[in-house]
Amino acid sequence: MTAKEEEKQERFQLLMTQIGLQDVTTYEEFTKDAKIEKLIADKKNKTWQFHLHVPQIFPAPLFHMMDVGMKRAFSQIAETEMQIVPENQTINETLIQEYWNLIVEPIGKQSPMIGKLLMEQKPTFKEPHFIEVAVHNDMEEATIQQRFQAKIIENYGKAGFPRLAMKMHMLDQSESDEYKAFAQAKQEEDQKKAAEAVQVMQKRQAEGQNGNSSAAPLSGPFQIGYKIKDDEEIKRLGDVYDEERRITVQGLIFATEIRELRSGRSLLQFKITDYTSSMIIKMFSRDNEDAAMFQNLKKGMWVKVRGSVQNDTFVRDLIMMAQDINEIAGVKRLDTAEEKRAELHLHSPMSQMDATSSVDSLFKQAADWGHKAIAITDHSVAQSFPEAYGAGQKYGLKVIFGIEANLIDDGVPIAYNDQHIGLQDATYCVFDVETTGLSAVYDTIIELAGVKMKNGEIIDKFEAFIDPGHPLSATTINLTGITDDMVKGSDPIDVVLKRFKEWSGDDILVAHNASFDMGFINTAYEKVGLEKADNAVVDTLELARFLYPHFKNHRLNTLTKKFNIILEQHHRAVFDAEATAYLAWKLIKDAKEMHDINFHDSLNDYMGEGDAYKRARPFHATIYAQTDVGLKNLFKLITMSNINYFYRVPRIPRSQLKKLREGLIVGTACSQGELFEAMMQKGMQAAEKVVEFYDFIEIQPKPVYAPLIERELVRDEKALEEILKNIVRVGEKAGKPVVATGNVHYKDPVDKIYRKILIHSQGGANPLNRAELPDVHFRSTDEMLKEFAFLGEEKAKEVVVTNSNLVVDWMEELKPIKDELYTPKIDGAEDEVRNMSYDMAHQLYGENLPEIVEARLEKELKSIIGHGFAVIYLISHKLVKKSLVDGYLVGSRGSVGSSFVATMTEITEVNPLPPHYLCPNCKDSEFFDDGSVGSGFDLPDKECPHCGTAYQKEGQDIPFETFLGFKGDKVPDIDLNFSGDYQPVAHAYTKEIFGEDYVFRAGTIGTVAEKTAFGYVRNYERDMNMTIRGAEIDRLVAGCTGVKRTTGQHPGGIIVIPDYMDVYDFTPVQFPADATDSEWKTTHFDFHSIHDNVLKLDILGHDDPTAIRMLQDLSGIDPKTIPTDDPDVMKLFGSTESLGVKPADIDSKTGTLGIPEFGTRFVRQMLEQTKPTTFSELVQISGLSHGTDVWLGNAEELIKNKTCELPDVIGCRDDIMVFLIYQGLESSLAFKIMESVRKGKGLTEEMEEAMMANKVPLWYIESCKKIKYMFPKAHAAAYVLMAVRIAYFKVHYPLYFYATYFTVRADDFDLTSMVNGKEAVKATMKEVNDKGMEASTKEKNLLTVLEIANEMLARGFHFQKVDLYKSSADEFIIDGDSLIPPFNAIPSLGTNVAKQIVAARENGEFLSKEDLQQRGKVSKTIIQYMDDQGCLEGLPDQNQLSLF
């Protein structure tokens, strides 16, 4: 070997030392002759590429260790990579697979779905150098080929492999199980390697301690592994930044998961937090005892864990592999006081985006502490009342129901000290003060300036600085521009005030926000021994709000800018006073012109009128329901605040609170309440006046007021204590109890972070972002007594304990929700439903009803009428009847089709009787009640043997019990699918039936979802310049979810209040999402809260009835006359024959593209596998496709294995009951089995025994056990009936079908492709498919539309261009063998503009593109698009002017 070669080997060994692998002996045979052939350093891009010559390709673990070691060792210098150059390039499948994870792992960062697909498999190797991977579909194949294939081959090449080729293998259905097993085995193999490493460490530890780690049964605290000593050093999770060999951490478990591996072992994975950070902990079971012990580790436990911290390639984060886990006593806050307090000011997650702890957790805490009562006081809402009531019952707490309201005075005065002075001739003294703060009591004036104005001219000026006697704060200097030098040595305040009082004389005093300036002046006058000013006063702020309510704000600088008034330096008294003077004169003139106001004592004549409530500044007050009357009054106030007085927030005028005061208790609330503000800003006298309105006074812990000190609104903690002591004195003097409340927004101090994230997400819109959030956790009695120790021990106990319980004792035990159902009453409803049912039955089945018909009717009517449900049927009948009269079919949803009375009253088209023939002429009938026929529609055509008339075919064989329960006492849930076009009409009709005051949209509450919370946390992490570990992000996300974000309305739910009650007996009322222009009001409570108390009608909007109506209009065919067993239509569900195209033409083996329920790729695959030929089999398909674990891994396997055929498998929930009864089981047991299976509860041993005793097949029993959710057969039958009708048009009237499909169901179009024909459409489809998983939602929706367009083109039809004079606004028009698209199919052209174009052309042809743009209100972009598409041929750009 040459010296140069030796040097290269030495360099390699030096490299191994630098990266910490000098002692790796396992791979010595691979490294001993290795050498660094060259190092390519790119200074510009800071990269180093090591070219290593080695005898043979490295084992994957060695390559990985070197790669990680180099990246870590040189991370501060350059990015590194290796190029292995082996002498021997022999490879095999084992080596290919060993490297696979390393090669594809980075792909997951770019495309998690493709990364997961590749990581969950191993490639196969085929000579000479081919690797093959499995994919599920074309999109996956295209994505891998285009984005990742070259990189995979390149990465193998860097590891020294010869040039590989790669191809994809499409999995068919039969291989899916094999693939899943393959992926599972692959994952377990990776975990096994990690487990082996853990076992080695555990073995060493056991040897060192001469003990064993066999786990004991859980008779005491949980423990796996060794006992961790009490004095062992605990590392904070927030201090773990890198891999560490052996450390101990502790924390609270907030998520657990146990995975059973095929090896028989278990993997325990849980997440813990110590509130400095969070971490994933993993542990593999060593034996069965460990595996059993894993089950005892629960969320909410505190544990101490010892193990090693390492980077986990699966989660791409630091995790701990645990060796020892010990349960420990958790960090628990106690309340040790003998006498307990009660919390009277507490927010739940229903305080919008402001409070985070659940009602249950807060109430549990109160109960654990031994408190006897707790109040709910969410911001303006009662939406947590139902949950709070339930939690109170659960934990034995008395619940006080209240709100923290936004109270307003009915009208804010414009003028004070009214005097009959002419406004046009008066002399005005316009002044402004600059102060050291907002409190007239604790702060002082540092500048006082004024100007005198008469007839719009300034005639005199006053200006003076005042020395405060102490340095100015930075805030004051920054806000006012006044410095210490400017005020130092100025006259003292008494001298300046005396001069100003003399100067202002008896003139009208004017200020912008006069209540503030006059408050300071009058308080200052009193301090220096002068009398308060009794001058007439005008407030320009309130006058501007009155005159210009539409302005966005009414700040001085905004108004002066609006009216071109010079304001040289805002927040300097002299400049503000002069600008205010000119503004005042402008306002005085406008007041005369707009409202004929001429005198000072007329300025308040309009106070409180119109939108005056919008101008009032809200302050907080707590309002509690003391009695049932008070609860109803509270509901009325909440309604009023949302319906009549909503402006940015719900507002309650003081006058309305006075009117509805009976049964209510009112408290002074927090720092935003008027009592605290009065004491802080105006002093004792003002506070004494304010407190007269309230029943009790609230004070809160000093930390709750911390933002006031931070913002310098309160000088310091000493000043805050003085304010609170004075409030206590005011209470004593007024004889009103002072209560210490917590203003609780979360349970524990550590929960503060969740609120911080939520408030941060709202940005500058939330004023709470102006300062650090206060500590507002739920405080124990001990903590509260400590907070108020500055009042003295006796007084602290009085406000914390005695008075809080005193207020609790004022309150009665209340129930905010009812126990019973209150349905509306319609006189004679019972007789009408009975008569309608029998009349229709006789009309169909003859005067002498068949026994099966009469028995079913009587059975149902007994339940319906006996339980008071007749009115529900009657209402539903009226709604459906009106829709039918107006020309729109109604589809039924859910299980209403299980009711024969619903069929007879025309609520549903589904007939639930056993399959039967029915003669429309002589009324003869023939029933098949032995289970031999699945649906009456499947019976062969037959003539009546009595009169020769063709039989009608009916009956879907559905038991009534699936609708109202076995006893017939379940509240009927009648869901009706109206046309989306007709839905608003149906909704409005309920107002006609019941009256507008008795029908409301069902309210919903939108809470922060996990995905949204994740965004909030990530934004917080970014804005705070933090790096948060994945497990900690999960914890923070969980803490932010479930908080109220908005309100809304159920898409079709209408709540009906009986006319013998009013809505306030059940719920307050509001507008959805605070949209005060909404046509409908909603229930304030989420409708689920009152679902069992009032009737809810589900009047839903659906495309199917809309499509049927359009098809009827186009064809003139009554959809009810369409046969349900048309042979060509049935062929559609198994082939493309009926369409006259080949499967390759439309890329589908069935013809169901665009058929509701049967057009998705998933259902089309089911059709291909099952090949249904009858209506009942289509119902089976519908049930199978909507259920959970009904098809996949269940019925699919049974059919594939030929265990049974499609008609025999369990498709819908009702099938179970019917089949079991036919098998001989007692009907009540059959019903119980059906209910248990459909709810995913499986079968009990007793159920299995009964089924086996009645010879139910074993496969049927096993199938029942797998099911998690099932679809009702009536729902499936109704859907299939609509689908078959629409399919009829597709087969026999294709252009009607396509025109309807594109009009009703499609939103996204590519008109360019569609107009240019089949090849253009296919090219666009390929473009979308080639994007694979990266295709957008809009592109995926377009793909569906293009599939239908392609099919239409394949059948010989075509699309025309949008036609300026033929196109409709929003419907596709048939023209010969083609369709003309509507205007709203043009990208970005909305329906309103489309209608405007149509309206404009009716008034005459367009003269030019310019004319189209002006009269049609069309944008230039749309004009350009239409021009490019050739829609505007012959139309000049501009109007032509002719002289002749």
From Swiss-Prot:
Gene this chain is encoded by: polC
Lineage, top ranks: Bacteria, Bacillati, Bacillota, Bacilli, Bacillales
Protein species of origin: Listeria welshimeri serovar 6b (strain ATCC 35897 / DSM 20650 / CCUG 15529 / CIP 8149 / NCTC 11857 / SLCC 5334 / V8)
NCBIfam families: dnaq (TIGR00573), polC_Gram_pos (TIGR01405), PRK00448.1 (NF001688)
GO MF: 3'-5' exonuclease activity; DNA binding; DNA-directed DNA polymerase activity
Task of the protein: Required for replicative DNA synthesis. This DNA polymerase also exhibits 3' to 5' exonuclease activity.
InterPro entries: DNA_pol3_alpha_NTPase_dom, DNA_pol3_finger, DNA_PolC-like_N_II, DNA_PolC-type_N_I, DnaE2/DnaE/PolC, DNAPol_HHH, DnaQ, Exonuclease_RNaseT/DNA_pol3
Positions with biased composition (Polar residues): 207-216
Keywords, sorted A to Z: Cytoplasm, DNA replication, DNA-directed DNA polymerase, Exonuclease, Hydrolase, Nuclease, Nucleotidyltransferase, Transferase
Region feature Disordered, mapped onto this chain: 196-218
HAMAP family: DNApol_PolC
Family indicated by similarity: Belongs to the DNA polymerase type-C family. PolC subfamily.
Protein name, per record: DNA polymerase III PolC-type
Principal cellular location given in the protein's record: cytoplasm
